[in-house]
Amino acid sequence: MQIISTSFRFWKNSRISHVWKSLKRWICLSALILSGAFFNRQDIAARRSLFMPVNRSVPDVAQKRKNWNGLISGFKASDLVFLDGSGCNTDMTRRYAYSLGGSRAVDSAPLSKPKSTTILSSIRLDGTLRYTTFSGGTTVERFKRYLETDLLPHLNGNSVLIMDDMKSHHAKAVRNLLDSSGVRYIYLPPYSPDLNPIEKLWSKVKAFLRKFKARTLNALPNAIQNAFHSVTISDCSGWFRFCGYAL
C-alpha cells in the first residue's frame, strides 16, 4: 500500500507524459509479480480453501476442543471406534470430467430420485468397517438396532466408541443400551468433523459411488459394498493420523 500511495503522489505532481510512462512501468511490474513463474519461485499454489465453522471459535467450543486432546490421549488409537452416518442416492455422479478444449464436460443424472439411502458405519485403526444401510433418515430406533446387531457384539471392554452430537446419538435409549453393554463411549466436541477420521471414509466412499453411478435402488447396495471393499488398512491408518491420533 505504501508503494501505491507513493506512486499516486508522484503522478499527481508530474506531467501527463511522465505519468503515462510511470503507469506503464507499474503495469509491467504488476504483471511480473503476478506471473506464474513468480508464484512457482515462491512456492505459492492455488489450493482448495479449508472452511472452518464459525462456531468453532466460540469460547465454550474452543475449550471443549482443547480438552479433547487431553481426554483422547488416555486411550490407545487401536481401541478407538468412530461412528457416524451419511446419505447417498441414485443421482450421484462425478463432479469433474475431461473434455476437449473449448467444449464443456457433460454428464447425466436422473432428475427424479427415490428417498435417500442412509449408511451407518464404524471405523477402526485396523481397517475394520461395520456398516448397515436403510431407506430414509436415522431414527433412534434404527440407530439402536444398528448398535445391538452390527456393532456392539464386536466390541470389548477396551473399546471406546466415539460419536458426534447428532440427536439420535444422545437419546436416552441409546445411552441406556451403551451403559448396559459396558462399552465406554464419549462424544466429540461440537463443530469438530476434523477430529473424526470417518469423514475421510465418507469422502472415499462417495467418490466411488459417483464413479459407479448406480442408477437404481437394486444396484445401489452392490455399489456401496464395492465402495467399502475399496477402503484399505493404509487408508484408515492415514485418516487416523491426519486427525491427530497417535498410532
PLM feature segments, named:
Residues 1-32, 74-76:
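A short, amphipathic alpha-helix used for macromolecular contacts
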Residues 22, 35, 84-86, 121, ...:
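Generic structural signal for small/hydrophobic residues in well-ordered secondary structure
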Residues 24, 60-148, 245:
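Extended, low-complexity cationic-aromatic segments
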Residues 26-27, 89, 138, 161-174, ...:
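Acidic, metal-coordinating catalytic cores used for nucleic-acid/nucleotide bond scission
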Residues 31-43:
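Major-groove recognition helix of helix-turn-helix-like DNA-binding domains
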Residues 34, 77-80, 198-247:
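C-terminal anion-handling pockets and recognition modules
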Residues 104-112, 181-197:
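RNase H-like polynucleotidyl transferase catalytic core
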Residues 164-165, 172, 186-210, 218:
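RNase H-like two-metal-ion nuclease catalytic core shared by retroviral integrases
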